[in-house]
Structures are given as C-alpha cells and as structure tokens.
Regions:
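Catalytic cores of the polymerase beta-like nucleotidyltransferase superfamily
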Residues: 1-476
C-alpha cells in the first residue's frame, strides 16, 4: 500500500453525506496503490438520490441516475476531483456487500468520513501487497462471466499476477460470456483494446480463456498454419498485427515520415462508441483475418490459400458487431476495414501509378484512407515467413507512403468539382440518366486529376470521347 495514501483527502468530496457510507471498489484500490483515481464508488445506508443531491449542491456537480432499478446515481463536473457513483449497500449490510464483489482487491472499504482503518474482510490488502488477483469467492466469475474480461483488464492495468485458482475459474466461466449481454461484453472489451498495451492485455485475456469466448472465430484460428510467407499461425499473426497498429499509432513517422501528423490526427479523431478511429482500428485488426479458418485450402502444389477470407470475414465481423450491439457507425467501420484489408497489397506489383490510379484506391477505401493504409502496413509487417524477402516489405511500405502522399495531395485539392454536373452532361449527350452517368463523372474526376479536363469545353470533349469508347451515342 502506498505510503502516500491520504484517506481524508480521498474522502473530502464526500463531506456532505449524512448517512453511513463507505468508499469501495477500484477507486479505493487505486488510491491505496498510489495510482490516479478516476472515479469513486460509494455505497450508502441512506437514500442514494438524496445523498447525490447533497454532493451536487455542495460541489456544483451534475447528477443523473445510473440505474433506477438499483438506485445508483452518478455525479460529475463542478469542483469534484473525479467522478462519483453512489449506490445503496447491497444485501444485509457492508460485509454482505463486500462478499458479493469480484476480486479481493476490489472488496475493500473505507468509511466515507476518512476516519478509521480500511475494512478488509477478504485479504485484499495482502493481495495488493503481493500484487495478485484473487477471487472473493469461488463462484465470483460463474455468477457473472463478464468478470473474466475484468480480471484480464485489471491484472494487465495493475501489472498483477492472476492467482492460479482465479485463472482456473476464469477458464471454467468463460463459455458463459457468449450468453452475457453484448453491450456489457463490448464495454469490457473496449477497455481492453484501449489499454496502454492492448496486445499484452488481449494475450492475457486469451491465457485465461476469454478471447475465444468473446470472439469465437479467433479461437478457430488458433493453430491454423499459413503459407511460407508467414511466420505465425493465424491467431499469432492477428495479435502481431494488433501490435503493429499500436506501434504505428504511437510513432506514425516511423512508417509515414513527413505525413506523421496526418496519420496521428486521423487516428486520434473520435469515431463511435467512445472509441477513436485508431482504437476502432485495433478492433478491426483483431477481426481482419477472422475467416481464415473457414476459408483455408491447399492447392495441388501444396500452397496454402484463404480465398475469399476478406469477404467472408466482413460478413463475420458484421454479425459479431450486431451480437455486441455496437453502433452502426462502428460496425460499418470495422466491416469496411476487414473487407478491404487486402486492397493495397494487390497493388504492390502494379506500380508505378498515376495520381488518378491512387485516387481510385482512396475512393474505394473512403472514408477511412488513413486507417486502411495503417492496417495494410501492420498486416505486411506481421507477415515475415521464410519466403518473405526484405524487398517485398520495402515495396509494400513504399507504396503505402506514396498512397498517403497522394491522399494528402488530393485532399488539398478538394472539393474537385466537375466543370459540368450530371444534369448538364446528360442534357448535352441527350441520354437518360443512369449508371453510365456516375461512371462518367468518376472518369471526369480522374481526367481532372491528370490535368486533361479543366473547363467546360474540355469536359464536353472528354465526355463525348468517353461515351463513344463505351459504344454509346455521343450526342449531337
């Protein structure tokens, strides 16, 4: 326990409370360890709503109900040093409440007055000192399988070892995650992938049986051998891709050099469900090869293939996100990333490209050009088998850099407006609007990028040539 622990300072914001109350949970645990306290959990023998109102008035904080069914209230803002959640004592009193908690290090209590000793009924102080995660009771995880994810997350966050009995209980309880509410599972998984070292946290989750319970398709990928261009099985490769995504996120200049700030800004942009684009890309990295087990084949030559794993994987990712009840925005981002993760690699041997050809790729992966390039690079870096040569990796990364340069250049030119809009082109060519018109507008955009269309006359001339090349009537 940290020598700097100050019980009175921790509980000072709770002075307006009138009924007996205690600080419990992760906030107390972190304070005892000398870690920053992001939130305080308070249990009270009084009326949580009335107590929340008293704190709100004293600190100018906002309050709102977390759960009317359980009588829990949350306070934020004002001059509160951190978020405060207030809820009633569960069961027959403090001891009963603490016995219902998950881990001994979370089953500690401190009187809200800041006076007296930390109440420890389950050896939590000892386990804090010994830096280990121990269950309060043998059925703690079975009663709520989502706690398996919490076990991995908190152990990783604190750098604690997981007690052997807790690990065994986690493996036994993990199958129950599939029957748990998707929203709760996704909330815990989001905390894992946004950890300081998400690859380490995910591997710890896997070690106690939780990863396959959350994403069964990844469990299917365990031990699935790949071609000689790979040095890892599919699951190992997937986790290494996640590592590379995080590494690029932290130091984009290592790959993208002068465009590091462009990458950093895009990955740091909020996307959905409390995740930034970069954090959502971590989830996409976990999903990108999830269909490889289902699509593995071996040719007569012995070559291992995974034909269509991008398309099938996109369908699997879509179904998974629906099970987890993610937002449509996050689901669409992940699905696009999985479906298109091979697109850049297919272009490596077709270089060099014109600006218009770069534009075709960028439009294909829109609105996620930066994230698509980061995932493509991470995927390439995690593919380093005996048949992979340094020049293959060099060419792939060079194309990614060139594509990022093109993205920056084209973005600076936007909006690229055609000299003639669709209605004007249809009228000039005396043709009814249809799919051909969208294709013509795309072709016109590419001609603009090449500098061959720049005004109405050049647009008219190009449109007539294009229609004629398609076997149509170019108009009068």
């Amino acid at each position: 326990v940290s020598r700097g622990f100050d019980a009175r300072a921790l509980t000072a914001p709770l002075a307006p409370l009138t009924a007996p109350a205690w600080v419990v949970g992760g906030g107390l645990r972190d304070a005892l360890l000398g870690r920053p306290v992001a939130d305080l959990d308070v249990i009270t023998q009084g009326d949580p709503e009335a107590e929340a109102r008293a704190i709100s008035r004293a600190h100018g904080a906002s309050r709102f109900p977390l759960s009317r069914a359980f009588g829990a209230w949350r306070l934020t803002g004002g001059d509160l040093p951190c978020q405060v959640d207030i809820m009633p004592v569960l069961g027959d009193g403090l001891d009963d409440d603490l016995s219902r908690r998950d881990f001994t290090v979370n089953a500690l209590a401190l009187p809200a007055t800041g006076e007296g000793q930390v109440i420890d009924r389950h050896g939590g102080l000892r386990d804090l000192d010994e830096r280990r995660m121990v269950l309060v009771g043998p059925s703690a995880l079975e009663a709520d399988p989502v706690r398996v994810l919490r076990l991995a997350r908190i152990a990783d966050q604190l750098g604690f070892a997981i007690d052997a009995d807790a690990a065994a209980a986690a493996r036994a309880a993990a199958p129950g995650v599939a029957e748990s509410p998707g929203e709760r599972v996704m909330e815990e998984l989001s905390r894992i992938i946004t950890a300081d070292e998400p690859g380490r946290a995910v591997r710890l989750l896997d070690a106690i049986g939780g990863l396959g319970a959350v994403i069964p398709e990844l469990d299917d990928c365990r031990g699935v051998d790949q071609s000689e261009y790979h040095h890892l099985d599919v699951l190992g490769h997937t986790l290494e891709v996640l590592d590379h995504v995080v590494a690029i996120e932290r130091d984009p200049g290592d790959v993208f050099r002068g465009n590091a700030e462009v990458v950093r800004n895009s990955l740091g942009e909020p996307l959905a469900d409390g995740l930034t684009r970069g954090q959502a890309l971590r989830l996409t990295a976990l999903m990108h090869d999830m269909a490889k087990a289902a699509t593995r084949g071996v040719m007569d030559t012995g070559r291992v293939t995974f034909i269509g794993h991008d398309r099938m994987g996109a369908d699997m990712a879509d179904a998974w996100c629906r099970r987890m009840r993610t937002s449509n925005h996050l689901r669409e981002f992940v699905v696009r990333g999985v479906r298109l993760h091979l697109a850049l690699g297919f272009m490596v041997h077709r270089q060099p490209f014109t600006l218009a050809q770069y534009d075709r790729y960028l439009r294909r992966v829109a609105p996620d050009p930066v994230e698509s390039l980061v995932l493509a690079v991470a995927d390439r870096l995690a593919t380093d088998g005996p048949r992979t040569t340094p020049i293959q990796i060099t060419r792939h990364l060079a194309l990614a850099r060139d594509m990022m340069d093109a993205h920056v250049r084209i973005s600076a030119m936007e909006p690229i407006r055609p000299p003639l809009d669709g209605a004007q082109l249809a009228e000039m060519l005396q043709r009814a609007p249809g799919p051909w018109l969208a294709e013509l507008l795309v072709a016109t955009r590419e001609e603009q990028l090449m500098g061959r269309v720049h005004d109405a006359p050049t647009a008219q001339a190009f449109a007539r040539r294009w229609v004629a090349s398609q076997g149509g009537d170019a108009g009068p």
